[in-house]
Amino acid sequence: SKKNIFKFFKKKGKFNLKFDMISSFAIFYDIENPNRFCEDIYNLLDENGIWILEFSYLPLMLKNLTFDQICHEHVTYYGLKTFKKISKKNNLKIIDAKLNEINGGSIEVTCAKIDSKFKESKNKINKILNDENKITENSFKKFNSRIKKIKKDISQFLKKYKQKKIIGYGASTKGNVVLNYCSISNKDISYICDANKFKFNKYTPGSNIKIISKNKMRVLKPDFLLVLI
């Protein structure tokens, strides 16, 4: 349980426990003090241990237009160049990195202590870093313009089919980002269906749309489903 995990790590200072491998998936962009976090990782790692982490990758967010990643939980948005500076500052080195399409575009990074036995995959790492150098201020302006177009397209669709029955599919965090950015409310969408029974009869924040079960959605027979997952 969460309580036992906290209890375990609170006690870790009482003995010299080191780890061969530490994983941090979908967490690094939630951390308010990444330097302190990396310092703790360094202290917990064995001299030849590795740290594997995966986080939403800013350049792919720009490319794939996954603006629904931008929410209150994600306090930072990293490229490899920025992460490399943070890890180096805390005596860690990147030994491998690869991109994937998880959550609309992520990067998996493997780190080790600077003085460890591991060699860096310089060709792979430098390829990613060189590609990042192509990102300019204009890249963000284009990102902004494309987001605005999506908002316009969705608004036009909802207006065009205002007399039809439209139900949202998935009461997710990302979906709520889209709903609120596009100013969609219960005037535009009748309901949102979800598989999680704990969400039933609750309402989406900001947009105030009632959440129902998938079974009820099927009974209602909507004309359109707006996918929000």
Label each residue range with its predicted role:
Residues D20-S23:
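A conserved beta-strand element that flanks and buttresses the S-adenosyl-L-methionine
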Residues N35-I52:
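A short glycine-rich, Lys/Arg-flanked "PGG" loop and its adjoining helix->strand segment in the class I
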Residues K2, F6-K12, F157-I229:
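A solvent-exposed beta-alpha-beta segment
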Residues I27:
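Hydrophobic adenine-recognition pocket in adenosine-nucleotide-binding enzymes
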Residues L92-N103:
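Conserved S-adenosyl-L-methionine
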Residues N103-K148:
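Flexible, glycine-/basic-rich loop-and-beta segments that form/coincide
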Residues L53-T76, L80-T82:
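Short, glycine-/aromatic-enriched active-site segment of Class I SAM-dependent methyltransferases
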Residues S145-K162:
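A short, well-structured juxtamembrane/interface segment
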